[in-house]
Amino acid sequence: MPETDGAPRRDHRSQPRRSDGKRAANGAAGDHGASGRDAPLYGALDLGTNNCRLLIAKPSRDGFRVVDSFSRIVRLGEGLSRTGRLDDAAMDRAYEALLLCGERVAKRGVDSSRLMAVATQACRQAENGEAFIERVRLGTGLKLRIIDPVEEARLAVRGCLNLFDQSVEAVLVVDVGGGSTELNWLTKRGDAFVLEGWMSAPVGVVTLAERHPEPAGDLDGWYEAMVADMGAAIAEAPVNPALRDLFVSGRAHIVGTSGAITSLAGIHLGLRRYQRNLVDGLWMTRADCEAAADTLMRLGAAGRAAEPCIGPDRADLVLAGAAIMEAVQRAWPSERVRVADRGLREGLLLQQMREARKPSRRRRRGRS
C-alpha cells in the first residue's frame, strides 16, 4: 500500500462490501467507547519490519472514525536476516518516520494514555532491537512496546473480524509482514468464531525477497522457489488436518490482511490510484490472485515501480508477498479470499476503546 503522509485519507470511513452484497460497518466494527463530537481521540502506532503506520481515531456508534493516518515504508528489517542486527540506515529511516508520527499525535492532542505504540518482528528478532526502542523513547517521547507473535496475531484478527462471512464454518486470517507471516485458523461455534490454532512463520516479504533476489531470466522458476520456501515454512500447521476439508469444499475462506493482498487487489481492479473503499472488503478468487501475480511478474521491476498501487518502494517486494499468499492458498485451497486493508492498528484501537468502556474497580466497589 502506498505511503500516505499527507492529509488523512477520507475513505477510511468507507464501508466494505459484505458477502451478501450489503455494506459493512464503518471503520472496524466492535466495541467502542463514547461516541460523538466529544469522544476522545485514540492512537495506534505499528512499527513493523517494512512499514511504520499510525491511525488516530475516535469512537463511533458502529466502530470508529479515522481522523488522521500515516504510513511510510521504512524497511527497518533490511539486512536483518543476514546480520541479526538492525542496520544504522534502516534505524534512521524508521526514527524519522516515528518523529513525524509523534508530531501528528501531539498536533491532534492524543493523550499518551490513549496511544498504543507497538513494534513487531524486526525489533523482536534484532539483538539491538531494545536499544533502538530506547533511542526512540529518548528522542521522540514515543514508548513503543515490542509485542510477541501471539499478541500480534490476536490484534490483527480483532481488526478484521467484521469481514468474516458469517455463513461459513471456518476462516483463515493471513497477516503477511515484512519479517514474518501470522496464520490464524478460526471455526464457527454458535454465533462466534473461535480460534482453533495459530502459527507464526519466520518468512515475510523482506526476508523472502532477500533470500530470492529477482533474476534476469526464468522468472517462473524464481517465483516457484519463493512459493516453495513459504510452503515449507507452513507445512506443519497446528490444527486438525480435517479442517482443510472445509476449505476444499467451499465451507471456509481466507482473509488476507497486509500490503501483499491489497497490492494484488489494486492490480486486479486496474486502479490508477489506490482506493481503500474499493479494496477493503473485496472478494477475490484464487484465479484472480494468480492472474494479478502473473501481471506483476510480466511487468518487470520498472513496470511495477510505475504502478500507482505498488510504487518504487514496493516494486521488489510485492511478488514475494504474492508468493506467500499463493503458498497459503495451495496449502489451504479456498476458492475465495477476502481483502482486508485493516489489521493490527485497528485491533489496537478496538482494544483500547473496549477497555475504556469497562467500569473502573472503584466504581464497581461503590455499587457493591
Where are these regions (language model features)?
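A short acidic Gly-Thr/Ser loop motif
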Residues: 45-51, 174-180, 257-260, 343
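Helical "lid/coupling" subdomains associated with nucleotide-phosphate turnover
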Residues: 42, 59, 79-103, 107, ...
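Short glycine/serine/threonine-rich phosphate/pyrophosphate-binding segments
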Residues: 52, 76, 153-157, 176-184, ...
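Tryptophan-centered short beta-strand motifs
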Residues: 64-66, 193-195, 243
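Hydrophobic alpha-helical segments and helix pairs
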Residues: 172, 177-194, 198
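N-terminal glycine/serine-rich phosphate-binding loop of ATP-dependent small-molecule kinases
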Residues: 1-43, 59-120, 133-143
